[in-house]
């Protein structure tokens, strides 16, 4: 078993409505509170970062599972949505919805379609970010599997 370490440097020179920066490997960006939460809305924010972590982990996990299963695809895309609730000034990351769209080869069998649906579900429970937030953030899956040319 091996532990992998990841590091992030953060700089926040001002107050609540100012702008900071983060740097982690290839990621270098400005950060601030989003406009929807009465911030300046510059760069990214923790809400987008959590959504991005969950979405990238999920789609990479799904692609790896499809490859290991020998399931050929023409296309794999996804949209994800994060829902943050604010009640009495308390911010709670309530739900993440993943909407993967899998397009299989035009000659894929019904067994391939069933396997793609199964892997879409399995990727959610196998992704390390999904496992890390499980029990704190509701995860919802709305997968679409089609044959090429449909």
From Swiss-Prot:
Against Gene3D superfamilies, the record matches this protein to: 3.30.300.20
Please name the PANTHER family in this protein's record: OSMC_OHR FAMILY PROTEIN (PTHR42830:SF2), OSMOTICALLY INDUCIBLE FAMILY PROTEIN (PTHR42830)
Q: Which family does it belong to?
A: Belongs to the OsmC/Ohr family.
Question: What does the record give as the organism's lineage?
Answer: Bacteria, Bacillati, Bacillota, Bacilli, Bacillales
Which protein are we looking at? Uncharacterized protein YmaD
């Amino acid at each position: 078993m091996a532990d992998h370490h990841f590091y992030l440097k953060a700089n926040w020179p001002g107050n609540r409505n100012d702008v900071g920066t983060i740097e982690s490997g290839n990621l270098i960006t400005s950060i601030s509170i989003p406009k929807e939460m009465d911030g300046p809305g510059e760069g990214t924010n923790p809400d987008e970062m959590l959504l991005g972590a969950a979405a990238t982990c999920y789609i990479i996990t799904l692609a790896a599972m499809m490859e290991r299963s020998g399931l050929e695809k023409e296309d794999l895309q996804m949209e994800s949505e994060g829902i943050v609730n604010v009640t009495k000034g308390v911010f709670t990351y309530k739900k993440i919805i993943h909407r993967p769209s899998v397009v299989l080869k035009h000659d894929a069998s019904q067994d391939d379609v069933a396997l793609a649906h199964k892997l879409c579900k399995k990727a959610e429970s196998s992704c390390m970010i999904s496992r890390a937030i499980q029990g704190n953030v509701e995860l919802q899956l709305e997968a679409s599997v089609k044959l090429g040319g449909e």
